[in-house]
Amino acid sequence: MARVKRAVNARKNHRKVLKLAKGYYGGKSKLFKTANESVIRALRNAYVGRRLRKRDFRKLWIARINAATRINGLSYSKFINGIKLAGIDMNRKMLSEIAINDPKAFSELVEVAKKQINA
């Protein structure tokens, strides 16, 4: 079997990693081994962060809806149950936007939910 010289591929890989490590402090931006470790960690954290962002936004929307429903005299869980029973198909993002930007319309949604719960 023929000998494989990796000079071109290795240099290409090093260049790619060092380009990703641009802006890192000290040896982490200059030395391949430390840069590679930092880049791998950064990419892993970015991957995890993209998933955490979804959770964080959902938590934020729920907190906003909960605050707005309690102002109107209803708990979050009862409100969600009421709008599901009423057949209102709105996601939490839309509901939180309405709660912030149009409180009057949101209070009407709360009233609809209350009627469905009591019916």
UniProtKB/Swiss-Prot annotation:
It holds the Pfam family Ribosomal_L20. SUPFAM superfamilies: Ribosomal protein L20. One of its GO terms (molecular function) is rRNA binding. The keyword Ribosomal protein applies. InterPro entries: Ribosomal_bL20 (IPR005813), RIBOSOMAL_L20_CS (IPR049946), Ribosomal_protein_bL20_C (IPR035566). PANTHER family: 39S RIBOSOMAL PROTEIN L20. This is Large ribosomal subunit protein bL20. It comes from Clostridium acetobutylicum (strain ATCC 824 / DSM 792 / JCM 1419 / IAM 19013 / LMG 5710 / NBRC 13948 / NRRL B-527 / VKM B-1787 / 2291 / W). The gene is rplT.
